[in-house]
């Protein structure tokens, strides 16, 4: 879609890598389109980064020992609590990413612990990305919400690819 607009509206031409330096009116398409198969083949940490960035989040700098948080989403309009406070205050949502076909209840249980542990009073909303989720995982998210009022949004990779995840945010 973007390539079509660049060609039709901006009258730019698609170029091969390395050729743009010679023609400033050209563009290079890179990393698109992703497919389920390509994403399954990515190294684990690259997949995590792809998913977090696709949600509009910030990936962790540290990949090992991340305490169950692969990235964070900072809500728009977040302001520091006080002068000299942290840039985004303490208002953020954790993202957990699993590069597996179906996340089960044990993974959701672990993420619930993360949401309860992080920050004063815990996190009110979190996002969990995977290729799929078991019905037990879905039921546990509903039960967790009923018990605590906290919300875990389950987002499949296909929903990200189809850009349907925006409605879940």
Describe these PLM feature segments.
Residues 1-169:
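Mixed-charge (Asp/Glu-Lys/Arg
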């Amino acid at each position: 879609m973007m390539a079509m607009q660049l060609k039709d509206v901006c009258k730019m031409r698609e170029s091969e890598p390395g050729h743009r330096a010679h023609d400033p009116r050209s563009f290079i398409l890179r990393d698109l389109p992703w497919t389920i198969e390509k994403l399954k083949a990515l190294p684990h940490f690259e997949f995590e980064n792809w998913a977090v960035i696709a949600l509009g989040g910030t990936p962790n700098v540290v990949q090992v020992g991340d305490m169950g948080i692969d990235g964070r989403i900072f809500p728009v309009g977040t302001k520091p609590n006080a002068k000299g406070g942290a840039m985004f205050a303490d208002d953020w949502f954790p993202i957990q990413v699993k590069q597996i076909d179906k996340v089960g209840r044990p993974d959701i249980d672990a993420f619930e612990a993360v949401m309860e542990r992080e920050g004063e009073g815990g996190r009110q909303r979190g996002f969990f990305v995977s290729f799929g989720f078991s019905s037990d995982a879905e039921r546990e998210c509903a039960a967790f919400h009923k018990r605590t009022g906290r919300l875990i949004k389950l987002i499949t990779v296909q929903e990200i690819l189809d850009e349907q995840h925006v409605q879940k945010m």
